[in-house]
Amino acid sequence: RIFWWGRVMRRLKIDELPQLINILNGTMSIVGPRPAAADQVEITRGGENAIAATVPCGLTSQSSLWDYIYGDQFPDEEEYNEKVLPIRLKLDVYYVKHASFFGDIKLIIWTVLAILYTACGKYPQWMHEKLVDYANENLDHNLNHNLN
C-alpha cells in the first residue's frame, strides 16, 4: 500500500528525496552527476565519460534534469538509450568541466522549477533547449579540441 504522500512524491518524481540522508552523511553531494546504476557503469563512466566519476555523485545535475523532464517520455529502453542517454552523458561531462558554486546554485533553482512545472502539468521547453545547448557546447568543445 502506498500512502498519499508516496503517490505525491512519485507523481512529482521526487521519490529520491530520501537520498538527502546520503548528502547529510557526506557520501553524496546536492549537485553532481547521478550515481551510475550497476548495469550502466561501463556506459556512463567509461571512456570520455570517466571524468564524471572524478566528482561526488549528486542529487541533481544537468543530466538528471534532462532525464527528469525528457527521459520519461521513452519507456522503451532502446529508444531511451538512443534519444536520452547520449545527451545525459554529454551533460555529465559538461557539469564536471564547468562546475562552480554559482552553477550549482543555478542547478538547484532549475531543479525546483522543473518540479513546479511538473506539478502544474507544464513542460519546461526553455530548460530543454538550454540543456541541449549545453550538451552541444560540450560536443563542439570536444570536436575543436580533437582537431587541434
Report the location of each language-model feature.
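Hydrophobic structural segments characteristic of membrane proteins
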Residues: 21-148
